[in-house]
Amino acid sequence: MVFDDYLIKSLITRYDNFPTDGVSYIDLSRLASSPKAFRMVIDGFVQNYIDANIDRIVAIETNALPFASAVAYGLNVPLSFIRKYKRTPEKWYKELHSGINYEALYIREDECKSTDNVLLFDDVVLSGHTISTASALVRRSGATINEICCIVALADCGGVAQAQSLDLNLFPLISF
């Protein structure tokens, strides 16, 4: 299947100054509801990483999970979650986060191995605060981050520069 940049972009909606002033919300729900677009997104990531040395995908909940699950399946690698809240009584690493809707991110202490080469997966990169916090969690577990990927990156919000300041490559499927 050929990647149709126009189709993908037509299914992404940007809401500026929502949920608060100075913040943009990117709605990807139409991508998930279009089988053709969903397949293009998944195939785009799988083709990009099929020959990469990826041992595990670590995805940030919630909106990244359906996409990351399909990419992990396509690459035949395990999928781990970074959560916004502790869900079980197990031991978790915690990193404080300056996000709007939650104060910290968590990953189970036994989720990643020190030998893992991780693809960190988020749905949208805006300011870079979430990928900064998530990358600190992955590194705390001892794993190495191969790259960060996202479906959409907004260049005017600082996230691309934030990834560079963390000395991490960022692969956005779509940039605005």
Model-assigned labels for residue ranges:
Residues 77-119:
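Short, glycine/charge-rich flexible loops or terminal/linker lids adjacent to PRPP-binding catalytic cores
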Residues 123, 128:
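Conserved G/P- and acidic residue-centered "switch" motifs that form tight phosphate/ATP-binding loops
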Residues 59, 120-121:
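Generic enzyme active-site microenvironment
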Residues 66-76, 135:
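Short Gly/Thr/Asp-enriched flexible loops that form oxyanion-binding sites at enzyme active sites
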Residues 1-53, 111:
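Active-site-facing substrate-recognition patch
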Residues 2-5, 10-11, 133-176:
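PRPP-dependent phosphoribosyltransferase catalytic core
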Residues 55, 116, 146:
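Conserved acidic residues
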Residues 54-63:
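Short glycine-rich phosphate-binding loop at a beta-alpha junction
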